[in-house]
């Protein structure tokens, strides 16, 4: 089943076109990796999928369907709740771990303390953080290690029960151990969530993704099952990128 359908998507900032005529379908409960050189439009694609592009001064034409319904027909709050995003640099709010995790649920109307406590516990467990920080929930989130901060941001995105999780280079600033922790977590998540991850790490894309899209200069060059993309790319530009000839 396709949870997202992208048809002839073009994205611009003013007169500068970032993506042009991109079409692809995203499979539900699968991990899709977006690869390509810096500046090719990967992150722009993510911010367009949950309409954050408009907050950043961008605009788009074409069509994005979420569960066969145009995303523009949804309220923005609903889209951003349903299609969550985690950024490259960990962005914990400058208050306690606990308040970080109840912020979004309270914004969306959940007030019951027991329910909030359950959300905190469940999301920390999903992010593999519960045993590490359960006794320190009142500690400032900014005092966590870099890897813990990123997992907290992922847990925070899960507190409002998204269906799709967008991740923009979530491991780029992390060491091997923390990267492995997050990859293991994402593989488990795909049972419950659809994941789209931008990564420069081709080995990471091969390890965890079911599908891979290669973008070059704003164009979707190739998209398909990850194993086939890496083993036998159809486009020579894909082959050259994978082999490290450029990018």
PLM regions and their residue ranges:
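ABC ATPase "signature
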Residues: 223-224
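Helical segment within the ABC ATPase nucleotide-binding domain
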Residues: 180-191
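Conserved ABC ATPase signature
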Residues: 139-144, 148
């Amino acid at each position: 089943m396709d949870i997202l359908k992208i048809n002839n998507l073009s994205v611009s900032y003013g007169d500068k076109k970032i993506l042009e005529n991109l079409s692809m379908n995203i499979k539900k409960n699968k991990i899709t990796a977006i690869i390509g050189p810096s500046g090719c439009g990967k992150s722009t694609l993510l911010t367009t999928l949950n309409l954050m592009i408009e907050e950043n001064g961008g605009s788009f034409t074409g069509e994005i369907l979420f569960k066969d319904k145009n995303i523009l027909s949804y309220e923005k709050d609903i889209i951003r709740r349903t299609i969550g995003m985690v950024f490259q640099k960990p962005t914990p709010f400058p208050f306690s771990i606990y308040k970080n995790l109840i912020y979004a649920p309270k914004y969306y109307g959940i007030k019951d303390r027991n329910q909030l406590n359950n959300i905190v516990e469940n999301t920390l467990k999903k992010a593999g953080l519960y045993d590490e920080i359960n006794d320190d929930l009142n500690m400032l989130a900014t005092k966590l290690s870099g890897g813990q901060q990123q997992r907290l941001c992922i847990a925070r995105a899960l507190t409002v029960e998204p269906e799709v999780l967008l991740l923009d280079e979530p491991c780029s600033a992390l060491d091997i151990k923390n990267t492995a922790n997050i990859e293991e977590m994402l593989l488990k998540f795909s049972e419950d969530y659809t994941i789209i991850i931008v990564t420069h790490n081709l080995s990471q894309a091969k390890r965890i993704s079911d599908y891979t899209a290669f973008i070059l200069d704003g164009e979707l060059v190739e998209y398909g099952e990850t194993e086939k993309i890496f083993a036998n790319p159809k486009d020579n530009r894909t082959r050259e990128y994978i082999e490290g000839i450029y990018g």
